[in-house]
Curated annotation (Swiss-Prot):
Coiled coil start-end: none
Subcellular localization, as worded in the UniProt entry: Membrane
Protein name (record): Protein ABHD1
Keywords of this entry: Glycoprotein, Hydrolase, Membrane, Serine esterase, Signal-anchor, Transmembrane, Transmembrane helix
Sample GO molecular function, one term: acetylesterase activity
GO cellular component: membrane
Active site positions: 203, 329, 358
Gene: ABHD1
Homology family: Belongs to the AB hydrolase superfamily. AB hydrolase 4 family.
UniProt organism field: Homo sapiens
Glycosylation sites: 10
One biological process term in Gene Ontology: medium-chain fatty acid catabolic process
Major place of residence: membrane
EC numbers, comma separated: 3.1.1.-
Length: 405
């Protein structure tokens, strides 16, 4: 009798399974609705806040991360796997640097040259990819495509060696060294002196932008900046990336990519560093200890990380910059964000979403159709380029000695 009750023909198991499945789906949707869907937190001084909220509605709207992959690590991974690759054609510029190196700038070609505005005054979006990234990365292509659709020029600054070109010197790139970025900005401003320039730095590129702003202050050559998933504190970043799961998913693959770049340029790099020792690195910290700190003249990795962390330099920034980060970013923990400093800064605004991961920010059921970061660029660039008068007189909020510097 019991066997007949449990038999498949009875339908009990099927009904029970259907009921449990429906309950699981209901609980999942309930959790998503109650805990995942949140408005981002916008942290800024009152003047900058008053500019951003009406001009960038995305900063006050609920973020709807993709229903079936809202966890931070999944967002980070699926962004690479799922997003489409827009067709972008580039024309490359090769710049020579004072130390004998070379830089590759990729200028995106306008889709319809007959509709081009005056290039001498057309706004320019300068994009800086993440570590080992280039103009061919999916996230870069989407941002470039957005800039082109909005009627701006778009140019990508590729870090040395990241487009496959050979290094001319032993130096590749370093988060604390902004000399190459200064060279690029000066080149663009010399070529288009009347065109407003907005820098968009992603991850490692965002660190470069923040450090450049802090070092150059008003002479940064930019009207504003947007940084996406940048890391404010190098010590907290490496600590987070060295946890077991993050190490497996992110730290080890990134370190392998860095080692490949060194291996490709062995002949020029081995003059300064022990290549074989560098290639044994299994973490970014080990790579920075064995290569980056040596190549760029730092005593050790600790000294380098202190110089590379923008967290302690926020008070030196004198150009408006909007920073986007997710609270579940495996590269940049919330504890590393300069929230208190941003609350008192006239120039720095932090936009913190509850979900999004690292350069993830996938949204909607079909995340390859729309992207949160592209929408943010659209609204922020429009506000900066088309309504510069709407920006408050931020310099007036500074002490008199800073206004005159």
């Amino acid at each position: 009798m019991l066997s007949s009750f449990l038999s498949p023909q009875n339908g009990t198991w099927a009904d029970t399974f259907s009921l449990l499945l429906a309950l699981a789906v209901a609980l999942y949707l309930g959790y998503y609705w109650a805990c995942v869907l949140q408005r981002p937190r916008l942290v800024a001084g009152p003047q900058f806040l008053a500019f951003l909220e009406p001009h960038c509605s995305i900063t006050t709207e609920t973020f709807y991360p993709t229903l079936w992959c809202f966890e931070g690590r999944l967002q980070s991974i699926f962004q690479v796997l799922l997003q489409s690759q827009p067709l972008v054609l580039y024309q490359s510029d090769i710049l020579q640097t004072p130390d004998g190196g070379q830089l590759l700038l990729d200028w995106a070609k306008q889709p319809d040259s007959s509709q081009d505005p005056d290039p001498t005054t057309q706004p320019i979006v300068l994009l800086l990819p993440g570590i080992t990234g280039s103009s061919q990365e999916t996230y870069v292509l989407h941002l470039v495509n957005q800039a082109l659709r909005d009627g701006y020029q778009a140019v990508v600054f590729n870090n040395r060696g990241c487009r496959g070109e050979e290094l001319r010197t032993h130096r590749a790139f370093c988060a604390s060294n902004t000399e190459d970025l200064e060279t690029v900005v000066n080149h663009i401003k010399h070529r288009y002196p009347q065109a407003p320039l907005l820098a968009v730095g992603i991850s490692f590129g965002g660190i470069l932008v923040l450090n450049h702003l802090a070092q150059a202050r008003q002479a940064a050559g930019l009207v504003a900046a947007l940084t996406l998933s940048a890391c404010w504190d190098s010590f907290e970043t490496t600590r987070s990336l060295e946890t077991p799961l993050n190490s497996l998913l992110f730290n080890q693959p990134l370190t392998a990519g860095l080692c490949q770049l060194v291996e490709r340029n062995r002949k020029v790099i081995e003059k300064v560093v022990d290549i074989d020792f560098v290639l044994q690195a299994r973490t970014i910290r080990q790579f920075d200890e064995r290569y980056t700190s040596v190549a760029f003249g730092y005593q050790d990795c600790v000294t380098y990380y202190k110089a590379a962390s923008p967290r302690t330099k926020i008070d030196a920034i004198r150009i408006p910059v909007l920073y986007l980060s997710a609270a579940d970013d495996p590269f940049s923990p919330v504890c590393a964000l300069p929230i208190q400093a941003a609350q008192h800064s006239p120039y720095v605004a932090l936009l913190i979403t509850a979900r999004g991961g690292h350069i993830g920010f996938l949204e909607g059921l079909l995340p390859w159709q729309h992207w949160y970061m592209s929408r943010l660029l659209h609204q922020y660039a429009k506000a900066i380029f088309q309504d510069p008068e709407g920006l408050p007189d931020l310099r007036a909020l500074l002490p008199s000695e800073d206004r005159n510097s």
